[in-house]
Regions:
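Helical substrate-recognition/capping region of FAD-dependent monooxygenase/halogenase enzymes
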Residues: 2-19, 23, 38-39, 48, ...
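Core beta-strand elements of the Rossmann-like FAD/NAD(P) dinucleotide-binding domain
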Residues: 16-18, 164-174
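N-terminal Rossmann-fold NAD(P) dinucleotide-binding loop
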Residues: 29-30
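Glycine-rich FAD pyrophosphate-binding loop
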Residues: 37-57
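Active-site-adjacent segment of FAD-dependent monooxygenases/related oxidoreductases
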Residues: 57, 62-130
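Conserved FAD-binding catalytic core of PHBH/FMO-like flavoproteins
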Residues: 80, 129, 154, 174, ...
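A conserved short coil-to-beta-strand element within the FAD-binding core of flavoproteins
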Residues: 141-155
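Internal nucleotide-binding/catalytic subdomain
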Residues: 225-371
Length: 513
């Protein structure tokens, strides 16, 4: 990545210099940049750090995220450095099982496994390399945005090249803040954070094993011990993570030091068997911003919401944000759909992410309980009838979808020849239709622009036929983020569905030209 500023950004142009400016180049920002350039948008990214952030952060993503990475073009690159997680178990201080969250190990409905463990710097490097290879984005490292001035048709962005000590500016049609919990863009939007009342300090430790330690196991374990709640997680290859809750009475001068860490890991591992790679003290928050958009300014990822890590859905939520927002920005900028489409970003995503955060807070209540009476009651209840936990599958909130299946995530079959649906479709709308409606659907796409916008997929293979039957429809429109946009039961509804996808708008623009 070039760590430079093009002097042209200081010139006055009748058109904005960029379609979208992204502030922050972590997983959310890098995923968004990849998806936007797939749709042909001109993107600029500002990142205040000079390299991939090295402190321990996310270690898990799910099959839906892997599907987004597939769209971005990095899924196969990631696979060699992933570990398929079998699930998570919650045990009390006596080691008795309370909650069993076993994940299916095979290929699931999203065309990928349900749970992957990863090393975040590997993911970020893959996203950055793919973006560089594809082109279409200017990436400015060690550049910090400090002012945003929203105009009628663009945003003026002022920033500092911190390596050179130079100030400059550029313009973009929209700005998306993927700049973390202390987001500058969120401050300019002026939104408040709703507090879901879970804030605890934990020390997060990444360890590299010197040799095999099969006894540690492949399951993540939540040790719900009131004396010291602790989490163990296996990573890919020889990586392991422990998360250790800071307790009242801990010596503030020693918390997080190597000596303090090894004392608390002695139950499982010693310095003779592993080395500390990195550690950090975090406060696990649970908050949601009350406004994710103001005009041409938007926020995503930790800038919009923060969750305790007990479901492994913090980074995943940001990836879903990027997936939801990218196609909407592209369609608005290309003129296929109105600007009001961007209002559906928050209305769809906020209830969805709230479900995961509230569930994580509830699980955190089990893990972090320290009151002796409450812990005793918890242990009696949960060991008497072990809970089998299943991952929530919330629908999107109100927005750009309709019908009984609208707002559900669509499946991605893996066919007998090993191919996946999304690879055949590409990053665009997909209309899954029964064989009788396939030709009318194809006939409706009378221009190359329409054909490029919507892929017609006849349901000739059993997985697609079965899914149509399950929805009770003859056609289902999958959005580029693979959520269901709507369904059709006959030719008239099919025509309306295609018009909803912006096909009519695309035709009108072509005729107007």
């Amino acid at each position: 990545m070039k760590d430079v500023v093009d002097s042209s950004v200081c010139k006055s142009n009748p058109e904005p210099d960029y379609d979208v400016a992204i502030v922050g180049f972590g997983p959310t920002g890098a995923t968004l940049a990849n998806l936007l350039t797939l749709r042909g948008l001109k993107v600029v990214v500002f990142e205040r750090d000079k390299d991939v952030f090295q402190l321990p952060r996310a270690v898990h993503f799910d099959g839906e995220c892997m599907r987004v990475f597939q769209a971005a073009g990095i899924a196969q690159t990631l696979l060699p450095n992933l570990f398929v997680g079998p699930g998570m178990k919650f045990v009390n201080a006596r080691g008795e099982l309370m909650i069993d969250w076993t994940r299916p190990g095979g290929i699931g409905p999203q065309g990928w496994c349900a749970s992957y463990k990863f090393h975040q710097p590997d993911l970020e490097r893959a996203l950055r390399a793919q973006l560089c290879s594809r082109g279409g984005a200017d990436v400015h490292l060690r550049h910090e945005v400090f002012a945003l001035d929203e105009r009628d048709d663009h945003v003026r962005i002022r920033f500092e090249d911190t390596a050179q000590g130079r100030l400059a500016h550029t313009t973009a049609r929209y700005v998306v803040g993927c700049d973390g919990a202390r987001s500058t863009v969120r401050r300019f939007i002026g939104t408040e954070l709703a507090d879901l009342k879970s804030h605890e300090r934990w020390v997060v430790v990444d360890v590299l094993l010197e040799g095999e330690r099969a006894d540690l196991g492949d399951y993540s374990i939540q040790y719900c011990d009131p004396a010291r709640p602790t989490t163990y997680t296996r990573g890919p290859h020889n990586r392991r993570r422990w998360e250790i809750m800071v307790m009242p009475g801990d010596d503030e001068r020693r918390i997080g030091t190597p000596e303090w860490i090894w004392e608390r890991l002695a139950r499982w591992i010693t310095p003779e068997h592993a080395q500390l790679e990195r550690s950090a003290i975090y406060t696990f928050h649970s908050v949601i911003a009350q406004g994710w958009r103001r005009g041409r300014l938007l926020i995503a990822g930790d800038a919009a919401h923060q969750t305790p890590p007990f479901m492994g859905q913090g980074m995943a939520a940001g990836i879903r944000d990027a997936s939801n927002l990218a196609w909407k920005l592209a369609d608005v900028i290309h003129g296929a759909l109105p600007d009001a489409l961007l209002d559906t970003y928050e209305s769809e995503r906020e209830p969805h992410v709230r479900t995961f955060i509230e569930t994580a807070v509830q699980l955190g209540g089990v893990i972090q309980a320290t009151d002796s009476d409450a812990v005793a009651a918890r242990d009696r209840e949960m060991t008497a009838a072990i809970r089998e936990f299943r991952t929530p599958q919330p629908r999107l909130g109100p927005g750009w979808h309709a019908g009984a299946a609208g707002g559900d995530i669509g499946p991605q079959p893996v066919f007998d020849d090993g191919s996946r649906l999304d690879d055949a479709v590409g990053y665009r709308f997909a209309l899954i239709v029964d064989e009788a409606l396939a030709q009318p659907a194809q006939d409706a796409l009378t221009t190359a622009a329409q054909g490029a916008r919507v892929a017609i997929v006849p349901a000739t293979r059993e997985p697609l036929r079965a899914w149509l039957a399950e929805t009770g429809a003859r056609a289902v429109l999958l959005r580029p983020d693979r959520y269901v946009g709507g369904v059709a039961h006959d030719a008239l509804e099919l025509e309306a569905l295609l018009a909803r996808a912006g096909v009519a708008c695309a035709l009108q623009r072509r005729e107007a030209a």
